[in-house]
């Protein structure tokens, strides 16, 4: 299965039990910042934004004072799981990033999708990739 298939079929799919509700954008990005696959709507990000995200995984709390930036959009960092999941909020939407052994799984959402639904979609794929040794 290609990485693009994971994005299309497991991240950009309808939310379970909520037909027509789906993430706004999603991607799988290598920890080196290389894009493995992304939705057409995923923002173009800067290397320093990815560096900040990786630093926060290694030093939890690093992004809290400045916020998480991706594609020029600033998200307020909210409670995640140290070293495993970063969550951010902006207005009626937000972002979830799950770290796997080799990659980062990104999900970006807007209402009517809820933070919990985004977390579920992103973390489910991230956990699967971890189980596969990825």
From Swiss-Prot:
Q: Which residues carry this modification: Phosphothreonine?
A: 114
* Disulfide-linked positions: 13-118
| Chief place where the protein resides | cytoplasm
Q: Describe how it is modified after translation.
A: Phosphorylated by MAP kinases.
Q: Where in the cell is it found?
A: Cytoplasm, Cytoskeleton
Q: Which Gene3D superfamilies match?
A: Dynein light chain 2a, cytoplasmic
Keywords (alphabetical) are: Actin-binding, Allergen, Cytoplasm, Cytoskeleton, Disulfide bond, Phosphoprotein
Note on file? The variability of the residues taking part of IgE-binding epitopes might be responsible of the difference in cross-reactivity among olive pollen cultivars, and between distantly related pollen species, leading to a variable range of allergy reactions among atopic patients.
Q: Which protein are we looking at? A: Profilin-2
Originating species: Olea europaea (Common olive)
């Amino acid at each position: 299965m290609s990485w693009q298939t994971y994005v299309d079929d497991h991240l950009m799919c309808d939310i379970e039990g909520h037909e027509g509700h789906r993430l706004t954008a999603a991607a799988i990005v290598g920890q080196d910042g290389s894009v493995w696959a992304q939705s057409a709507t995923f923002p173009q990000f800067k290397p320093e934004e990815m560096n900040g995200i990786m630093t926060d995984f290694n030093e939890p709390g690093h992004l809290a004072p400045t916020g998480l930036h991706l594609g020029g959009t600033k998200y307020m960092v909210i409670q995640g799981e140290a070293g495993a999941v970063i969550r951010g909020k902006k207005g009626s939407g937000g972002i979830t990033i799950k770290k796997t052994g080799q990659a980062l799984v990104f999900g970006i959402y807007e209402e009517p999708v809820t933070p919990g639904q985004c977390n579920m979609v992103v973390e489910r794929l991230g956990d699967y990739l971890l189980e596969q040794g990825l």
